[in-house]
């Protein structure tokens, strides 16, 4: 090998390596999305990847869109975007009939050219309406206490805390968005002076349905 040929070989090697690095400089997030109840693959799920950046030595403090995609028929997705100084990252999966879910990602896991995997599972949505009705005249000191005991809610208005209804209230109705295809356990108490009568039961909330729970006291 002549001297000129040797240097040409070295130059081409460096150029090829540089180009290869340039090709692989992007961040890549991939994975699959399934139904959290049935484990079936979900297609047409909207995938949104967001990031917070460190720019000019300062922390931006807000999320910006890094990339987006839609899952295939097999539930898989792949998002690729330009690498940057990420300090926080998250991926969101959303689909009609399901509760939107956000996954926080490790910013340090992202390296240029590497493919990071993150699978998502979405819960089907359901709604429940609770009707608490007083059927007759009750003593002034009587009170109805009601609560769910194991519900997973997707609205700020609902939780598993007690709801207390006094005898001055004729009826009370409220509705909550919950994780579907599950049995919700509940308990209610009718509190009279010197006596408390309670009942425990459950109601099934099927996906994409409104379940109605009527309690009379």
Give the role of each language-model region.
Residues 73-89, 163-187:
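Short Pro-Gly-centered beta-turn/loop motif in secreted/extracellular proteins
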Residues 106-125, 129, 196-217:
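Extracellular beta-sheet/turn segments enriched in Thr/Pro/Gly and aliphatic residues
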Residues 38-59, 136-156:
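Short, ordered, surface-exposed loop/turn motifs in non-cytosolic proteins
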């Amino acid at each position: 090998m002549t001297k000129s040929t040797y240097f040409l070989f070295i130059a081409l090697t460096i150029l090829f390596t540089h180009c290869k690095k340039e090709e692989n400089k992007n961040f890549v997030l991939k994975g699959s999305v399934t139904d959290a109840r049935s484990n079936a693959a979900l297609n047409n799920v909207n995938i949104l990847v967001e990031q917070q950046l460190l720019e000019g030595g300062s922390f931006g403090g807000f999320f910006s869109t890094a990339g987006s995609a839609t899952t295939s028929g097999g539930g898989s997705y792949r998002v690729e975007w330009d690498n940057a100084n990420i300090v926080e990252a998250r991926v969101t999966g959303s689909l009609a009939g399901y509760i939107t879910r956000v996954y926080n990602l490790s910013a340090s896991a992202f390296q240029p050219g590497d493919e990071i995997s993150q699978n998502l599972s979405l819960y089907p949505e359901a709604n429940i309406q609770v009707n608490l009705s007083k059927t007759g005249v009750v003593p002034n000191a009587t009170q109805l206490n009601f609560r769910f005991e194991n519900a997973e809610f997707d609205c700020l208005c609902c939780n598993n805390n007690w709801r207390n209804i006094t005898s001055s209230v004729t009826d009370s109705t409220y509705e909550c968005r919950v994780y579907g295809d599950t049995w919700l356990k509940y308990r209610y108490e009718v509190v009279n002076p010197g006596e408390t009568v309670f009942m425990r039961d459950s109601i099934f909330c099927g996906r994409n349905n409104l379940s109605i729970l009527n309690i009379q006291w």
